Amino acid sequence: MKLLLASQSPRRKELLQCLGFPFEVVSIHCDESYPSQLPICEVAAYLSLKKANSYTHLRSGEILLTADTIVSCSGQILGKPRDKQEAAQMLKKLSGNTHEVYTGITLKTSTKTTTLTDKAEVEFMPISSEEIDFYINEFKPLDKAGSYGIQDWIGMAKINKISGSYYTIMGLPTHLIYKELNKLTK
């Protein structure tokens, strides 16, 4: 079986490499809208499946892996920020609070589709305006849901507690992928 990763995320590429499965990166183009009435806990899985279904080149003997990560704080989804100002607003919202991170994955073959979601909770200590400005200017988190990467400075300095998989927060629930890929490749 040939594994195809449909993601441009350097973090997802790195994590999948660490699992030891050889893979090839493929591009997909998919509108990332979702129904507004969809429960927050289902959005990441919905988008992951939507991405998988938008890939039309899947052949027999191939496994397509897609993923989507969302951050939810106080019932509001925090996606990727449009600019530095929106990133600062998101980080202020996360400061001193606990939020949820949902990562949905889809593994698709020519005959089977499996979609799973993993949830983690993250508790931030208070983050000052100066720390927010430093983080945004030095680490450029505009490509990350919720405007932060747990593996960055802000994760090391300002996260008080996590519940769930660290790798789910990074954007790829490696434990689920390992289990499912082993099922598909045996």
Task: Identify the function of each model-found stretch.
Residues 14-18, 35-36, 57-58:
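Short loop/helix-cap segments at secondary-structure boundaries that form the rim of catalytic
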Residues 8, 28, 110:
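Cofactor-binding loop segments of dinucleotide-utilizing enzymes, especially the Rossmann-like FAD-
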Residues 22-24, 125:
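Compositionally biased, low-structure terminal segments
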Residues 17-19, 33, 97-98, 171:
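Short acidic/polar alpha-helix capping motifs at helix-coil junctions
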Residues 24-34:
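A short beta-strand-loop structural module common to alpha/beta enzyme folds
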Residues 2-21:
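N-terminal beta1-alpha1 ligand-phosphate binding loop
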Residues 11, 31-33, 113:
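Surface-exposed, flexible loop/turn segments at secondary-structure boundaries
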